[in-house]
Amino acid sequence: MKRKISIQSEHQLQKQCVKWFKLQYPKMKMLLFAVPNGAVLAGNDLQRIKQWNRLKAEGATKGVSDLILLVSSGDYSGLCIEMKTIANHSKQTKEQKEFEMAVIPQGFGYVVPKTFDEFRKVVGDYLEKGEY
């Protein structure tokens, strides 16, 4: 009998990573936060468009990374983290790539971890060595 392989969603991965970070680095827990640009909006098409337009007017921007770590380390001002998963071969969108290219010259690091272990390694290396 074949064992069913559980595929982790991006939501589950991000939740696991944030929980780990807050336990591992309690003094910095307020400095890692999510940017809810990918939030699922409720309602019909017209209602969702209105909700997005309201969020956009408040500064929501397509392509901004899922998580931002506002801790300087090494030569970096902070770390932008775009969560992806191995499932479905998820890739960055055009807007996410544009955001990456916009923040790097400003002194921010940018990473795209696809597993919990990758997240732990890049965040640990970033905070401890100033590199990722």
Language-model segments: residues:
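Catalytic phosphate/metal-binding cores of nucleic-acid and nucleotide-processing enzymes, i.e., regions
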Residues: 1-132
